[in-house]
């Protein structure tokens, strides 16, 4: 591949910066926020926070009723999948327009897709009956990079989620690596190397949590989050993309990060942000250990704002590092 070709392709993709990535308008959630989907999620991730399903308990909390797990934000507007041909589309739910940013990269041979970063912001927790829309705009595309997975581009977009009243309920900045798959790759780190450790701070350490990652854990999380990308359930497809096996999707990873922190902080905790960087894949046969430490704390009126540095690692390296910011009513603050 020549430099001229690379630059020309990047210029084509860059022309989309600041523009909606879909010409058909915002994505509309197929369903309103509902208990069955919440139940599927919490069962798949074994998240027993009572504010997600126990209406009587939730009514006594700051939320006043059942709310959806915050890490489900992206799940609600995931498109209904067209299963036929999904592998050829790299896991995309439907046909990707040829002149779209991802369509241009696919046509250029960069058909591999790997999520690398996610920053979630929550303006409020979602309630039963909320019907979401999401508008997604391209933010940036990197120069062509060489990684263990092959040549490719880091592509970043921002999705803004609104409710029926057009009020913003959350945002996500999402980065993926679009690459030319190589058949000779034996990937152990997802092409990103070891993610940087969270800067340690003085404060309480969260008790470690060990997740025995199995194929069932990987597939259950993908289905509960409505992610039908073959790399999360089809081993042959995953290894063809350079992964050692099927691997956990980023929605599931965010879900486990949310569970880990709220298991410690309690059901009155409200997450404001989940910001993570992915490194080594979470794959069957490797126990994933979550650890955390309080790295910041301040008061805002009657609430404590707490920042927790988190890390989840297996024998392949750091799967995810990042921070979670949450609030707690002062009387309920974990300490």
Which residues does each PLM region occupy?
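HotDog/MaoC-like acyl-thioester-processing domains
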Residues: 1-26, 115-209, 282-335
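Short flexible/disordered coil segments
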Residues: 88-89, 93, 127, 275, ...
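Hot-dog-fold acyl-thioester-processing enzymes
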Residues: 2-117, 183-268, 333-335
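Short, intrinsically disordered/low-complexity patches at protein termini
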Residues: 92, 152, 156-157, 230-232, ...
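Catalytic-pocket segment enriched in acidic/His residues
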Residues: 245, 252-297
